[in-house]
Regions:
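AAA+ P-loop NTPase nucleotide-binding core of proteostasis motors
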Residues: 1-514
Length: 514
């Protein structure tokens, strides 16, 4: 590696002179696919399975995106090898879902036996749990019977398909058998016949924790409806979400310049209007989960020397070699959403750090490494000009985006350097209307109902009067939707917990809460 070359060869001029340095860079996706196609036959022969070309492409694409810290083609080869081994194992062993369900039945049987032993010595408090165990056992047995039947059908069809592939006289039966197998599997195969893109995505999901559904999503279809997907979580900000979605579509289709991040946005607006929730929703939609959100609170970086915390200390300073908070986070997750919160509170020297990031998509850390930001979406949040926005919308509720941008331009120009201001897109978040606030109240109360159902098995009936009261209480200009959580935590949830504890202390367990 380059570090070893510097350590052992460069320091010895005589030794360095006797070697010609050949720089070997990581291949691009097309070259990596070509290399894997050359290796594919060896792995297929070793594991005794067929590896499709879409599996090769998926191995390269998904490994580049989700397996950080390693290089292509090495990580794609490991991914393809593991996927091939899984397909081979699925043909020779009982599928993992069946094994897991049998283990669940065994665990329930052990718990049931322990409870019966307690009852035998006079403990009568386990009747409700015994009934629940019986219901769980019935449900698992029904699922197990259905899956074992389907597994038998899949295994029979798979064996017939493998036999047809080796028998030239039966080649015409392959298409019909393949259709039957697809109909039986219904997008949830218990065993694999070939190594395909789904098999590779399953391995990535197990290694990284990214949901399989996110890995298998059609990115083009997802981008077309991105603003609608975001609007399910961010309520009442349609124009802002539309602006973000349009910019991201331009980046993903290759129309925007390729030497910068996917998008750089400054989200400006009053507190509690959905700016942080937008970052969470984008991480979930684009990169498979909220774990792909990197949050940096810039209110902690009000001194010029705090720059080293973000990018790492330079040589000779305390902390050299430990990396920076931002640079190391992006190195580990190059496909992520970077949220720079409260950007107006950061020192100007800290903001100067982002000129090259916004423009060319990279930052050089304290050790001289170039950290690639080109696959990130960068969101900055700020309350600059919030009072002006609220004042204009109070006077003219139907003010256009252009009018709001003209209103904010002097405020932003006073705070940000013109060169920095030209490097990001400003997105304005409006004060939430009553209808949007009521929708958010309903979502928050629904989350409380789900928690009660999950922990206590209780059904919840929420009166309209409660939703109306919470909505009216949250229509304050300075707090927005953030006040909903405050009201729930301070007034609603303490009363609920008191009632629940009182009922449980009295030995009663209510099934419905109103």
């Amino acid at each position: 590696t380059w570090s070893e070359y510097k350590q052992y060869f460069e320091r010895d001029a005589a030794l360095e002179r006797r070697f010609q340095m050949v720089k070997v860079d990581e291949p691009d996706d097309d070259t990596a696919c070509l290399m894997l196609r050359g290796l594919k036959s060896r792995y297929a022969q070793h594991h005794g399975v067929h590896i499709t070309d879409e599996a090769v492409k998926a191995a390269v694409t998904l490994s580049r995106r989700y397996l950080t810290g390693r290089q292509l083609p090495d990580k794609a080869v490991d991914l393809l090898d593991t996927a091939s081994a899984r397909v081979r194992m699925s043909l020779d062993t009982v599928p993992e879902p069946l094994t897991r369900m049998k283990a669940q039945l065994t665990a329930l049987a052990m718990e049931k036996q322990a409870l019966l032993e307690d009852i035998a010595v006079g403990n009568t408090a386990h009747g409700e749990r015994l009934a629940a165990i019986g219901e769980e056992e019935v449900g698992i047995i029904l699922q197990l019977d259905e899956r074992e039947t389907r597994y038998g059908q899949e295994l029979k069809l798979t064996e017939e398909l493998l036999a047809c592939r080796t028998d030239i006289s039966r080649q015409g039966e392959i298409a019909d058998l393949q259709m039957q197998l697809t109909a039986v599997q219904q997008n949830t195969p218990l065993l694999g016949l070939d190594v395909d893109a789904r098999t590779v995505a399953t391995v990535i999901a197990d290694w990284t924790g990214v949901p399989l559904s996110s890995l298998m999503k059609d990115e083009q279809t997802e981008l077309l409806s991105l603003e609608h997907s975001l609007a399910k979580r961010v309520v009442g900000q349609d124009s802002a979400l539309n602006a973000i979605a349009q910019r991201l579509r331009a980046s993903k289709t290759g129309l925007a310049p390729e030497n910068g991040p996917q998008g750089v946005f400054l989200l400006v607006g009053p507190s509690g209007t959905g700016k942080t929730e937008t970052a969470l929703a984008l991480a979930d939609e684009l990169f498979g989960g909220e774990k792909s959100l990197i949050t940096i609170n810039l209110s902690e970086y009000q001194e010029p020397h705090t720059v080293s915390q973000l990018k790492g200390s330079p040589p000779g300073y305390v902390g050299y070699g430990q990396g920076g908070i931002l640079t190391e986070a992006v190195r580990k997750r190059p496909y992520s959403v970077v949220l720079l919160d409260e950007v107006e509170k950061a020192h100007r020297d800290v903001m100067n750090l982002f000129y090259q990031v916004f423009d060319r998509g990279f930052m050089r850390d304290g050790e001289g490494r170039e950290i690639d930001f080109r696959n990130t979406v960068i969101l900055m949040t700020s309350n600059l000009g919030s009072d002006l926005i609220m004042q204009m919308l109070d006077e003219n509720p139907v003010a256009t985006e252009g009018e709001l941008h003209e209103l904010l331009r002097p405020v932003l120009r006073d705070h940000f350097q013109p060169a920095l201001l030209a490097r990001f897109q400003t997105v304005i978040y409006r004060q939430l209307a009553q209808a949007a606030m009521r929708t958010i109240v309903g979502m928050k109360l629904g989350q409380v109902s789900q928690r009660l159902a999950r922990h206590y098995g209780m059904k919840t009936a929420i009166a309209d009067s409660l939703s109306d009261a919470l909505t009216d209480a949250c229509l304050l200009p300075d707090t927005g939707a953030r006040n909903i959580d405050s009201l729930l935590n301070q007034q609603i949830l303490p009363v609920l917990s008191q009632q629940l504890l009182s009922q449980m202390a009295a030995g009663r367990k209510p099934h419905t809460l109103t």
